[in-house]
Regions:
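His/Asp/Glu-rich metal-coordinating catalytic cores
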Residues: 1-104
């Protein structure tokens, strides 16, 4: 974290800067978002049986990646959980989620 950059923001008049990140307190690095899609594609292409993916119900981009990988390999996706189903319906209705025909 570039603490000097945060200090400069304060000097420029920013009174409050808030951010949140899952596992921010855990040392090390996580994979970049752009790296996840190819991993899912590989997994969906090579797994011989059922694949179970867990995700936050607010992570529309991750669900899109799963839908794309499933579609590319002729697999089906089942959304489980009231929040997941509701959020993905809203995302699809607003055009933020493209559900390939026959995948859900």
């Amino acid at each position: 974290t570039d603490l000097r950059a945060f200090a400069r923001l304060g000097e420029e008049g920013v009174d409050l800067f808030m951010t949140d990140s899952t596992n921010a307190e855990v040392p090390g690095f996580t994979a970049l978002e752009k790296d996840i899609g190819p991993v899912l594609e590989n997994l969906f292409g090579h797994a011989e049986r059922r694949i179970i993916v867990a995700s936050f119900s607010s992570h529309v981009h991750r669900v899109q990646q799963v839908l794309n990988a499933a579609s590319a390999h002729g697999r089906k996706v089942a959304l489980v959980g009231r929040s997941m189903v509701r959020n993905m319906k809203i995302a699809a209705d607003l055009g933020y989620l493209d559900v390939p025909k026959g995948v859900l």
